[in-house]
């Protein structure tokens, strides 16, 4: 895994590295969490949004790393050899993740460009979601 030992050993942290999120839900675990942090690879957040949000308490903070290379179409990703540099694709894929979150009771609070680029140099985005507070205008056109 990639988590620092200090995080892994913290008794307040439940780690689900190398776990298929499709098999997880608040119901299957019989618990939900105050903070949910999501960093997925090779899968769209949209396909598992219901699972992600089901893991969060009603007043939880949910932080998702949006990786446009996994949200874009296969054609878009293959055209650019997996490195998405098109601003329109960034905005569209972020918007699609936001809509998916909204469909499952998640409300966008904030978004930033990740200070750490993806391995191949992809621009990635950290999204803060809440179930408790109303959605905020993220001004995506100013972000990218």
Residue ranges of model-derived segments:
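S-adenosyl-L-methionine
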Residues: 1-47
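Flexible, glycine-/basic-rich loop-and-beta segments that form/coincide
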Residues: 123, 130-144
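Short, glycine-/aromatic-enriched active-site segment of Class I SAM-dependent methyltransferases
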Residues: 68-85
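A short glycine-rich, Lys/Arg-flanked "PGG" loop and its adjoining helix->strand segment in the class I
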Residues: 46-63
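Residue-level signal for inorganic ion chemistry
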Residues: 3, 67, 121
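Short alpha-helix
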Residues: 90-104
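Conserved S-adenosyl-L-methionine
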Residues: 106-115
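Short "lid" loop at the C-terminus of a central beta-strand within the Rossmann-like core
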Residues: 21-22, 68-72, 115-116
């Amino acid at each position: 895994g990639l988590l620092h030992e200090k995080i892994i050993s913290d008794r307040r942290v439940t780690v689900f590295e190398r776990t298929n999120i499709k098999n997880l839900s608040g119901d299957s675990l019989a618990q939900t969490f105050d903070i949910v942090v999501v960093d997925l690879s090779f899968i769209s957040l949209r396909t598992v949004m219901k699972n992600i949000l089901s893991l969060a308490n009603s007043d939880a903070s949910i932080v998702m790393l949006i990786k446009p290379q996994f949200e874009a179409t296969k054609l878009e990703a293959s055209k650019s050899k997996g490195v998405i540099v098109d601003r329109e694709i960034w905005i569209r894929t972020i918007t699609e993740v936001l809509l998916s979150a909204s469909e499952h009771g998640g409300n966008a609070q904030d978004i930033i460009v990740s200070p750490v680029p993806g391995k191949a140099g992809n621009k990635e985005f950290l999204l803060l979601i809440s179930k408790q507070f109303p959605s905020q205008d993220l001004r995506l056109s100013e972000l990218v």
